[in-house]
Amino acid sequence: MSSSNLFKPIPLGRKVLQHKVVLSPMTRFRADNDGVPLSYVKSYYGQRASIRGTLLITEAVAICPRAKGFSNCPGIWHQDQIAAWKEVVDEVHSKGSVIWLQLWATGRASDADTLKESGFHLESSSDVPVAPGEPVPRPLSEDEIESYIRDYVTGAINAVQGAGFDGIEIHGANGFLVDQFLQASCNTRADQWGGSIENRSRFGLEITRRVVDAVGKDRVGVKLSPWSTFQGMGTMDDLVAQFEHFISRLREMDIAYIHLVNTRWLEEEEPGIKTHPDVDNQTFVRMWGNKTPILLAGGYDADSARRLVDETYSDQNNIMVVFGRHYISNPDLPFRLRLGIPLQKYNRDTFYIPFSDEGYLDYPFCQEFLDQQDVDQVVVAA
């Protein structure tokens, strides 16, 4: 596997990565009650940065208090949060790796009680609940939409200029606020923010445009999940046309990358479930072309990741593979993948334990990795 294109260097933004294995953004609930990352969060990311030239994307990070729909998730709107994230960034950079922060607003997918405790209401593009019987969100006003856009810009500036992140990823996937505007299954507005493909795209595109203006196009990526039905998404009739329009406009902005989530893993975990024939996003991958990197996520393992870059997209040199659960349990994942070393099994029960380092810092590096040289000197590029 060491000769795979998975282990060839690739430029992304202002850096050159040494391989194409990416740490997925994954919520872990390791922030305090004020949204400040706990002291050992820097060790978690530092462990996974130990192979030089690795791209890490942080867990979803709330852009403002009203965007933080769950307890013990981190934010990026006040100085204590920025300072804690700077420690994380410094740790990752000391290992020779690269880290981007994911900007997040939860919208109707929030825990309503958590918002209420903080003095906020459940809100979204429209008054459509995430599922039948769930709390009904309040549609955002024009002024509130503008406020959210400004908060995304401030979050990007805080991340890049304040904490020193190499870039930011706008979370437009998985049924959170940007997705709630993008898809007609949620967005029933009849103003400039809904009612047509162009109008439903406006919120996410305006966020992206203004963030690009604030921090630079080579420091901005966008994550989308076109086929996901998670949190009430993926059921609109013109889904392909909607995402073709949105992605084509992102491409025109020449952003650093696009991050696409497929739902192939659902077929494995939920036998009998029906997924779209293009669940692997080939339509959108081909549409993006070789312009800038394409990050693909969706339950990949060593074999399927290799096939993706070496066979499915052998004619494109910009495909990167995003790993989530396997990266939780294997902090040296790129090293293991290149040498064919068996992966450690993850423990789902420890994924989301607030104020605990169990299942967070205690997965060991493989002995081969430790024997090779000091962990901060390891490079896996072929």
Curated annotation (Swiss-Prot):
Q: Which of this chain's residues are annotated to bind substrate? A: H171, N174, Y352
For this UniProt record, the keywords arranged alphabetically read as follows: Flavoprotein, FMN
Q: Establish whether keyword Glycoprotein is in the entry.
A: no
What GO terms are given for molecular function?
FMN binding; NADPH dehydrogenase activity
Task: Supply the Pfam families for this chain.
Answer: Oxidored_FMN (PF00724)
Output the InterPro entries linked to this UniProt entry.
Aldolase_TIM, OxRdtase_FMN_N, Oye-like
Detail which positions bind FMN. P25, M26, T27, A60, Q102, H171, K223, G299, G324, R325
Query: Which domain of life, per UniProt?
Result: Eukaryota
Protein family according to the UniProt entry: Belongs to the NADH:flavin oxidoreductase/NADH oxidase family.
Q: What does the protein in this record do? A: Probable inactive dehydrogenase; part of the gene cluster that mediates the biosynthesis of fungal ergot alkaloid. DmaW catalyzes the first step of ergot alkaloid biosynthesis by condensing dimethylallyl diphosphate (DMAP) and tryptophan to form 4-dimethylallyl-L-tryptophan. The second step is catalyzed by the methyltransferase easF that methylates 4-dimethylallyl-L-tryptophan in the presence of S-adenosyl-L-methionine, resulting in the formation of 4-dimethylallyl-L-abrine.
Q: What is this protein called?
A: Probable inactive dehydrogenase easA
This chain's source organism reads Claviceps fusiformis
